[in-house]
């Protein structure tokens, strides 16, 4: 069973989605799978999808879940601040940015760029590694999917309400680790 939200920029109402919409959709999917199978669910997700899994599990208080497995989904966002910017400064700036994101989201190209800026040295090393191996097709082929993804294939836009809420709750205030994030008006830990 797979929950795929599609590319918000291509889905009707996709750019108006909130973080709560995504978390409740995952929770609803758990209920539907349990109804079909009669069994509890192993919930898994990658990147932001994994964070939705964490959030849905907390929202449900793990009811109906056997396990949660995530890949590339930080529970602690404090180590993600790039360029050595102090976390308290970054938190205040991101809070201000989130307050002003209510009118516009983040296009897919900006999502890709933002990801690369989280670790600019790693991005640069990856680029240099690729260029130095251009002569060796066999060395490049196993990583082609990853290269295409990091170059921009597969990135989607962030809806403004979901992005603002994510930045405010999980980046500026690190609520995934600290607890106390809000889903559908309910405080969740």
What are these regions (language model features)?
Residues 33, 56, 170-174:
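Generic structural signal for hydrophobic core residues of well-folded globular domains
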Residues 155-189:
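Conserved serine/cysteine hydrolase catalytic core
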Residues 9-40:
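Catalytic nucleophile-loop/oxyanion-hole region of alpha/beta-hydrolase
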Residues 3-4, 45-46, 71:
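Short His-Asn-centered micro-motif
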């Amino acid at each position: 069973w797979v929950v795929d939200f599609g590319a918000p920029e291509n889905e009707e109402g996709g750019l108006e989605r909130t973080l709560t919409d995504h978390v409740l959709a995952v929770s609803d999917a758990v209920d539907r799978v349990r109804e079909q199978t009669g069994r509890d669910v192993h919930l898994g997700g990658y990147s932001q999808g994994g964070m939705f899994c964490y959030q849905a599990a907390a929202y449900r208080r793990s009811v109906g879940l056997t396990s949660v497995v995530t890949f590339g989904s930080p529970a602690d966002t404090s180590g993600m601040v790039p360029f050595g910017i102090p976390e308290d400064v970054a938190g205040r700036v991101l809070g201000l940015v989130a307050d002003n994101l209510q009118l516009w989201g983040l296009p897919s190209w900006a999502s890709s760029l933002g990801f690369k800026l989280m670790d600019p040295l790693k991005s640069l090393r990856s680029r240099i590694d690729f260029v130095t191996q251009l002569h060796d097709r066999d060395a490049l082929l196993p990583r082609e999917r990853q290269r295409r993804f990091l170059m921009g294939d597969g990135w989607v836009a962030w809806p403004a309400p979901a992005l603002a809420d994510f930045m405010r709750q999980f980046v500026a205030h690190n609520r995934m680790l600290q607890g106390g994030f809000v889903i559908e008006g309910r405080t969740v830990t």
